[in-house]
Each structure stands twice: as C-alpha cells, then as structure tokens.
Amino acid sequence: MIHTLETTVAGRKMKVDFGKTGMLSNAAIFMSYGDTVVMINANASKEPREGIDFFPLSVDYEERLYSVGKIPGGFIKREGKPSDKSILHARSIDRPLRPLFPKGYRNDVQIVNTVLSVEQDNLPEILAINGSSLALCLSSIPFTTPVAAVSVGLVDGEFIINPTVAQRENTILDLTVCATKERVMMVEAGGQEIDEETMYSAIIFGFEECKNIVAFQEEAVAKFGKTKNEPVLYKADEEVEKEVKSFAFDMIKEAMYIMDKDERNAQLDKVKEKISEEFSEKYEDKGADIAEVIYKTQKEIVRNMLLNEDRRPDGRAFDEVRPISCEVGILPRTHGTGLFTRGLTQVMTVATLGALGDVQILDGIAEEESKRYMHHYNFPSYSVGEVRPLRGPGRREIGHGALAERALEPLIPSQEEFPYTIRLVSEVLSSNGSTSQASVCGSTLALLDAGVPIKRPAAGIAMGLITSEDLEKEKVITDIQGIEDFFGDMDFKVAGTEKGITSIQFDTKIKGLSNSCVKDALEGAKKARLHILGKIKECIPEPRKELSKYAPRTEIICIDPEKIRDVIGAGGKVINKIIADTNVKIEIKEDGKIFVTSNNEPEGVKKAISIIEGLTKEVVQGEIYLGKVTKTTNFGAFVEILPGKEGLVHISKLDFARVEKVEDVVSVGDEILVKVTDIDNQGRINLSRKDAIAKKEEEKDK
C-alpha cells in the first residue's frame, strides 16, 4: 500500500511516498522537494559482523545524469565511479546519523540515495539527508532519533532557508545545518568572511527550521514506522573487563600521563605486552575483548583528565595552540611552497599555476561546469608512522581536500585580476590532529609564495569537546591533538581570515551540541586563528611581487566579440596556426577577452598578441602602415598592411618620379610604408607610398 505525507519547507512542498518503490528493502521512500526527487533505501544485515571494533555504516549517494537531462561524456556513456561531490554528499549524510545508532551496534547498515530528478532551486543533497533519517526511522533498524537538514543563505542581511539558484548567486553564506529536535548534530559552511556572531545566528536559524522537519518525520514514523529490532550490542566479557582493568588500570594511567607522544606510546606498548603475558593463556580467544578493555580504560583516563582535572595530555592550557613554525620557498623549481608545522602535525603545500585552459572540467548534475581553483590532499601512511599500501585518494582525502579548498575559495582573485588556473596539493608529512586545518595554513603560505594576490591570509584550527555522560558538563578545547580527537566528543574545524570565517565543518560523536557549546567553539577558534595568522604574517606578510621564473606568463587582450571568428578561422585554422607558430596557449571568452599563456617564452606571447591584434584591427583611412608587398602587376603593387588585409598601391602612387615598371621600385617581399588614401564602399583599400613618404618627411621637418 502506498502512503503519502506532505509538508511545506521554505514555501515549497516536501512530499514523501512510502511503499511506492523498493518493496524488498527494509525501508524505501520516494522523497521530493519541488521537482527534485531522491529515492532512499535503507537495509541492515541480520547478524552483527564478527571481528570488528567499529560500526560498519555505509552511505552511498548516487547521482544519475538523466536527473538533469544529460548523457554522460566520454566513450562509455554511463555513470562511472562516484564524483568527488557525490562522495562529499555521502559523508555529509553519514556524519549526523552515525552517532545516533546504539553504541556497540555491529550490524552492517547501508543507506543508498539515488538522485532521480533535479530542480536546481532545490538541492538533492539536503533532501537526501532528510530522507536517509526518515528511511532509518521507518525501518526496523534500531535508529530512533530523527535528524533534519536545511541549507541557509545570507542575502542582503537576511537569512534564507533553502535558497534558490538566484538567491545562491547573491548569498555570502552557504551553510548546511543538521539537527535533532534538541541539538545541532552537524554543520558545513562556506562563507565570505562571516563574523562569528552572524555565523552563530545563522546556525541557530537553521536549527529552528530543522525542528519543523523533525516533527514531520516523527508524524510519519508514528503512522507508518515498523517495529524496531532488538539490537545485539557488542560488549566486552564482564569477567575479562574486570580482571584486565584491575590488573592494568594504574599502568595505563601512568602511561597516559606522559606528555611526550612517542614516550607515551612506547610505554603503552610495554603495558600491552604485560597484559598479553598475564592473560594470553587464560583468555586466548578473548583478544578482541582485551583490546576493547584497554581502549575503554584509556578513554576513561583521558576524559577524566580533561573534564575533572583540568589537564591536557601534553600539559597545554585549554585555549593554547601548539608551537607553530612556517616556511616558504623550500622547493626550488615549483611555483610556490609552504611548510606549516603545528606541534607534531606538519603539512607541505605546493602551488602550481597554469593557463586558463587547465581548468578542471566537471561532468555532474550541478550547473557548475569547471573549476579554476582546486586543492588536493594526500595522507600517506608514513605521516602516522604506519605501513600500508599506497592507494588512490579515499573518501577522507577527498573530504579534507574539499574542506581546505572551501576555506580559501572566497579569497582567490578573479581571472581578470589573476588569469591563471591554480592547483594546490597538500602533502601531510606528519599527523597528530587537524591536518585539514594545517592544510589551510600551508595553502596560504604556498599562495603567498607563488605571488597569488589573495584578499587576505587564511588559517584554520580544530576545536574539541569533552562532555559528561549526562551532557550537563562540557569543556571546549583549542587545537586538539590526535589523542584528544580520538577520545573526545567533537571535531569542530573553523577556517578564516582576520575579518571572518570562510569555512566550518563540525561533527560530533555524541547526540549533538548545545547552543552554548557552538558559541564557545566559534569564539575560541577566532582567538586561535588570529594567533596563527600572526605567525603566518611573520613568515611572509604579503604575496610576492613577482611570479616564479618557472611559472607560466599570461597576458590579456580585449577584442570586439564580432572579431572572434577572425581569430579562430574556419575550422580553427587561424588560431591553431598562431598556437603552432608561437608555442602559446590561447583561451577566448565570449565577451572578447583573450588570454595568451606561455611557459617561459615571453616573446611567444608578444608575437601571438601582435598577430591577434593585426587580425582584429580595423584599417583606418589616413593612417600610415608598414606593409609587405605580396604581388606586383603592370598597374601597381598589392601590399598586406594587416594580417589578411591587402590594398593596392597604383603605379602612379609608388614614387614622386614617373615609374615605368613597378619592379623598378618594389619587389615581392619588400616592406614599405604606405598611407591609406581611400576605402571604397566594397571595402577595397587604396594605398599610396608617395603620400606616406611625404607625410613622414613633413613630420621630420617639424
């Protein structure tokens, strides 16, 4: 039986159909918002997965190009692996949902979001978060707390829920808020240097709207929800937990209080060896339980240290940033480099400049077709002292790269100001917490070193949180290191300039953040960010005045758009010849702007521009030109005065004396000065060498 429920969000209809599709799924819904339609299917394995110490939740976000009436490019003509944007949207769905599953739940859970129809005014990724929550709540899977999501824009000082395309073009804020009816679960934001107070107000504004969508989900669950399965939750054997904890608690505590990370880990390894020696025979088949007890004991000790003893593992104050060092120009042949070190976290970012033709072409469901600025993030195993095969970028690398990219995007100059494609690559050399925000700092250094005229330097910081079991007591921590992230409750990343915030991403391991916690985190992040920006400015206060000698050079000229066809030529013949003759790259825009780029060949750029100017320049009557003789006849000489533009010098106009034979004065290939004496109504150009000489003599006498 098909059931339908409707509600209104931001003046537009949101509709859900149950029982219409996916009859064999645990839960399947067909959800629409305007003309945007997403199908969500949620399923779980019947039994827990053995031998794992994590919750195996899998979220997929599948974009179908037919949803926007497009056929995929390339030879295969079907969708391939998920795009970076699809991966980012899947991560945005995962983060607010994961903390709300029961602790110890080990059943495989898969949520598949398939985008079927897209109206650009209504973002499918926002609909997918709401639909994923609703599908889980309707299913028999033990998920009982609805989560809602909205997008928030800021146009002319007014907050807007789920802005349309026209509104998104004018917004200075792109914010996604996910929340239960009681607390904020997840925030993603990009902004044009938004102040902390405005950002906080925007988050709360979105939170209030989320409550209405949560109420809609609760209504649907009350009417159509399935009975929930009783979950089988993993828990360490009580006897094992009691004995191991009694034996090892003091030793683990002693190790956890060592401030130096390497020394602490070395001591923990010794403790684990002692535990193994003590219990390997008695509990030879309980290795997973023993590992769980060790983890829980470490977590208990660290959290108590932070929450009740006001002490951090490395001895810092709660609002203190780790020691920072900045370097630039460390690689000799690259266009710009920045090495940023904060404690044991170290990132090297390399900037590369290219022609505008080097932009990344996008083939997705969004209206955006290309990217001129991009940031890529690499996290090799050696950065954490581990050994594992090097693969391509995973979801984490793509997510962290996009986060740092978003932090700097509002600061990148326009292509008119800086006509280059910009690629940043952040190499994580050492990781002990918040490498994504270190990438923001490294990227700023690299851009400044490359001579990119960014509006202002940017920096990023990660804030953490420790809460009591009842969530009544909480402490916000500045610049969390690995151990605080691992055992803590929040990773709240904020990047921006001295003027305001350019990006936020936070998620939590608990059932949401209080409003006061959000505010405290924003304020703490600002203080830390300004401190880091001071260190960056000490290293390199402004962009270099000159580009690297190894960087390409680009010049811009503007022509009449009606003349573009003259530059391109039939089948691209003219432009391809210019490129071949001058060894440059040429990009032509519809408005008549032409970008000419060359790698280390400035003469090639000058030559190409000269040719283009000649092709597009109009012949002016009365002007004098230096032309080349292309043909002689018995009645005169034809002279090319601009590329593709010839005129006739009649034999009587060649010289002051009588000329019997044209070849007595000029030959094919000669360069001569000529004056345009007339352009008839058919466009034919009459020239005079005699008048040009006379005019030059007259100017010389003056």
From Swiss-Prot:
It catalyses: RNA(n+1) + phosphate = RNA(n) + a ribonucleoside 5'-diphosphate. Its cofactor is Mg(2+). Residues 622-690 form the S1 motif domain. SUPFAM superfamilies: Eukaryotic type KH-domain (KH-domain type I), Nucleic acid-binding proteins, Polynucleotide phosphorylase/guanosine pentaphosphate synthase (PNPase/GPSI), domain 3, Ribonuclease PH domain 2-like, Ribosomal protein S5 domain 2-like. It holds the Pfam family RNase_PH_C. One of its GO terms (molecular function) is polyribonucleotide nucleotidyltransferase activity. It is found in: Cytoplasm. PROSITE patterns: KH_TYPE_1, S1. Residues 552-612 form the KH domain. GO terms for cellular component: cytosol. Keywords: Cytoplasm, Magnesium, Metal-binding, Nucleotidyltransferase, RNA-binding, Transferase. Mg(2+) binds at residues 485, 491. InterPro entries: ExoRNase_PH_dom1, ExoRNase_PH_dom2, ExoRNase_PH_dom2_sf, KH_dom, KH_dom_type_1, KH_dom_type_1_sf, NA-bd_OB-fold, PNPase. GO terms for biological process: mRNA catabolic process; RNA processing. Its EC number is 2.7.7.8. Belongs to the polyribonucleotide nucleotidyltransferase family. Involved in mRNA degradation. Catalyzes the phosphorolysis of single-stranded polyribonucleotides processively in the 3'- to 5'-direction. PANTHER family: POLYRIBONUCLEOTIDE NUCLEOTIDYLTRANSFERASE, POLYRIBONUCLEOTIDE NUCLEOTIDYLTRANSFERASE 1, MITOCHONDRIAL. This is Polyribonucleotide nucleotidyltransferase.
